């Protein structure tokens, strides 16, 4: 077999994802690293739950991105995409949830949110530690004001049906525009305020 000549990303596919209302979802977790040496990582209690807009079907065509992927940019124009109310009121049918809404959903379904978020924190920490030598090396070479700099990360985590967490993507300096909806604005505004 020949290797493709164009750029590609190879990523493990979670075959039995945890579903909510039949939809695949991920959790955007925000972290802040304020020191590479010694390592200092902060987890923010804000974040987003982002849903695929099509019902999950493991046999769906792999090119049906609205079934398999939860990325906002790929789902926002789908007719099934549901924004929260202008006043910020959230509903189960929305395509994005806040962490507090997600926690209430978990509790109402007899799922322990504390245990789940410990699992998420565990895999996020491992992912950041896995890349830390590269981050520390870059930081030492490129950052002249090491004691006054920081880096924000947005990590996308998916859960399987057994509540095991997997980091699917790590984003450096994730988008903070918050212009899509009230939920984005509220979460990202608070996040940026806390960073400063």
Which residue ranges define each predicted feature?
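Glycine-rich phosphate/pyrophosphate-binding beta-alpha loops
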Residues: 171-179
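Catalytic core of tubulin tyrosine ligase-like
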Residues: 1-151, 159-166, 182, 186-195
